[in-house]
Amino acid sequence: MLQPARTKFRKQHKGRNTGMATRGAKVSFGEFGLKAIGRGRLTSRQIEAARRAMTRHIKRGGRIWIRIFPDKPVSRKPAEVRMGKGKGNPEYYVAEIQPGKVLYEMDGVDELLAREAFRLAAAKLPMQTVFVIRHLGS
């Protein structure tokens, strides 16, 4: 699973996920991409589950790029603990996703195979996505 090797600070504020993605909004590495049109958070487990679904479908052909990285820690308190007494420990890492962000890219496969692989991957993600092609303008 993806997570930072080390961070400057262990915990972060929750923050607000607003605006549209300006960086990482174009397909830059592969020929096909999976773009988010919804807003939300992707955990490292969800990112990995989608990657596995794509990899299994395209078998040996093609190459996949993961364009997002979970760098925001989400803390949580243990079960049955009273409120207060400080912030909980970091439990997992998430990537904040704005609409327009390209999540995955693929190359070296035909369009039908890429579409089906991205459809399987999108089923693992908690937001709406759309299939994009590089030369048609992402």
Swiss-Prot record:
UniProt superkingdom: Bacteria
Keyword rRNA-binding in record: yes
Gene Ontology molecular function terms on file: rRNA binding; structural constituent of ribosome; tRNA binding
Ranges for region Disordered: 1-20
Amino acid composition bias (Basic residues), ranges on this chain: 7-16
This protein's UniProt keywords: Ribonucleoprotein, Ribosomal protein, RNA-binding, rRNA-binding, tRNA-binding
A GO cellular component entry from the record: cytosolic large ribosomal subunit
Claim: Chloroplast is one of the keywords in the record: no
UniProt-listed InterPro entries: Ribosomal_uL16, Ribosomal_uL16_bact-type, Ribosomal_uL16_CS, Ribosomal_uL16_dom, Ribosomal_uL16_sf
Any GO BP: translation
Similarity comment: Belongs to the universal ribosomal protein uL16 family.
Assembly information from the UniProt record: Part of the 50S ribosomal subunit.
Function: Binds 23S rRNA and is also seen to make contacts with the A and possibly P site tRNAs.
Name of the molecule in the record: Large ribosomal subunit protein uL16
Organism: Nitrosomonas eutropha (strain DSM 101675 / C91 / Nm57)
